């Protein structure tokens, strides 16, 4: 797992209460508090247990396919004419994204706690697929809550989950997206607290989830750091990742937070523009509040009602962000910027045609920012981007927009 942080480190959070500065914490129903505290105790034991680490590492190697490669995007670099661009190829993992890293870790915890049923929420369906996958691997029943809107736009992943034996429950409340799915999952958890483990897919939710998810995803940055040192003999100048709830981003960022020479940029979903409500840029255009068990930046109105965000990418369509990102934003260690739907779409097509890699729409947002920045950087500079998921799930969405048909 992680190397111990240095004193005065950006990597030492959260505190015992699960706070990163004023963000994080655990704001949950009384019925859930004993379970949350049990989970926290089990997590504290597990992360110091050599047998747990060994099992996690073994599954990482033989089931997920780690380490994922670091790939020099030669043609994209030449086309942009600036910094060298490297991708951390998380889309090559089993199930096609970074989500499996966290799911394997959490299902091992669920087994340790004696839980007999798994529930999960999903937006793009990648976390749902990864949850259904690990539930099948360990022989546990799995229920996945998914917004009705997302069920429609992510049909291939819905079919995958069902094939894997999971029950997919469409949620029609609100806009029928990730926030609404998470609300339903929390309701289920309160009702079935003794038997059920809630496998949260992003670095948000009540403590210890943000810390736990980050630590399971930190393998991305740990590997990438070693790989870039082997490839280039030095660290990158810039690390970039897309941010929805923020698990793939914190996974690659965490290892680099204490490296002063490394600039770090998180890319939010700018949707149709920040002047209206059709975006999901919580840090750029939101304000602090409490949602889903933690204090963080949210898209909310003057009365504290959560707004319904929008993104072309189902995985970024969440009106909040993990609390560690909120803190990193406020202290200025990480810069967060929005990318619009149309920019992500262009980046999606660029990568597909230049490198023969079809990216998911989520990392296409990060790629759009890389495409903007690379030409302004020197040819001796290095950009590292997390290519967090593959785009198979998005081909129909993109085809529809581009008028390609089936």
From Swiss-Prot:
Keywords from the named record: Amino-acid biosynthesis, Aromatic amino acid biosynthesis, Lyase, Pyridoxal phosphate, Tryptophan biosynthesis
Keyword Repressor listed: no
Cofactors demanded by this protein: pyridoxal 5'-phosphate
Top EC class, one word: lyase
The organism's place on the tree of life at top rank: Bacteria
Pathway: Amino-acid biosynthesis; L-tryptophan biosynthesis; L-tryptophan from chorismate: step 5/5
Keyword Manganese: no
Reactions performed catalytically: (1S,2R)-1-C-(indol-3-yl)glycerol 3-phosphate + L-serine = D-glyceraldehyde 3-phosphate + L-tryptophan + H2O
Cellular component terms per the entry's GO annotation: cytoplasm
EC identifiers of the protein: 4.2.1.20
Entry-annotated residues carrying N6-(pyridoxal phosphate)lysine: 99
Molecular function GO terms recorded: tryptophan synthase activity
Protein family (similarity comment): Belongs to the TrpB family.
UniProt subunit comment: Tetramer of two alpha and two beta chains.
Function: The beta subunit is responsible for the synthesis of L-tryptophan from indole and L-serine.
NCBIfam families, alphabetized: trpB
The protein, known as: Tryptophan synthase beta chain
Source organism of the structure: Rhizobium meliloti (strain 1021) (Ensifer meliloti)
